């Protein structure tokens, strides 16, 4: 049994720590369940969890074992697990769950707010963390559950939830009266979901995708961007149009260049991810100084989710997101290639490719345990 851990200050460093499932079983208390993690997805989204692990609290969900120095953490992942031991009435051995897990073989959960469809983990150390991450879905409560979709669900649902929230926030704000939406790191899966959502809205402004030269052909093939511009051709961005930027990259050079060109036409910049997380500590330079920080802000999807659940109710929120997800999942079949990684040793070999951005944009990694 193993737990995959990441160095908090250098995401390229990782280690495997042996874990004791027998001890976890022996220590199981009344009200607890033990689950065996079956599979999980790993994407640039997980890298963002690490890059903002301290500021937002992602390192706190699953405290790393054998970590007296505090140097190591568990990057949260989305995936599936089965109950292997239960001291909770109504949760049976063998039941399948979808949710937020550590990259490990097993996890102890303390279910609360149990319903036929879901429960919340009531572990004390998670009480102050965003509720959306503490929610576990019971596959036994889904009439339309299709196990063949597990890989795509683990890969895309966490990302497309953010895509949905971004679409909704932009629509709710009337696109800030912009004439174009500029999406940075247009090949990222969250960006693709956003662009596809905007393409479904007849009232949306034109959508411009910025990406690397190597990913340009792929992004163009998706057909959801009105224009695709590579990072070495940023002068092609029409700086005369009032613009909203949605940044998935954290790339200070790209942001500084485009902000500087747009000037007053840069209405707002929504910062979402950090596919270029290594740029965040780059010493200030003239380009970085051009970033218009007073009109930039970090978008935290869990807060938007809680707002919309309050506005629409849980059922109303679920209906809207389910429809969005179903459309995106169907579209993903034309471009997504799922790669299975067998176990933690194999995952260790490809982990850094994701962290440093070497993965093909149409590839999705699912680790099978």
Where in this protein do the model-derived segments appear?
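Glycine-rich phosphate-binding loop and adjacent beta-alpha segment
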Residues: 257-330
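Adenosine-nucleotide cofactor-binding segment
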Residues: 199-255
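N-terminal Rossmann-fold NAD(P) dinucleotide-binding loop
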Residues: 191-192
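NAD(P)H dinucleotide-binding glycine-rich loop of Rossmann-like/cofactor-binding domains
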Residues: 100-179
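Short acidic-hydrophobic, aromatic-tinged amphipathic segments that line or gate anion-handling sites
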Residues: 226-236, 300-301, 338-343
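A short N-terminal beta-strand-loop micro-motif at the entrance of redox/enzyme domains
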Residues: 10-40, 44-46
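Glycine-rich beta-strand-centered segment in the early N-terminal region that forms part
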Residues: 26-40, 54-107
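C-terminal hydrophobic helical "lid"/dimerization subdomain
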Residues: 306-369
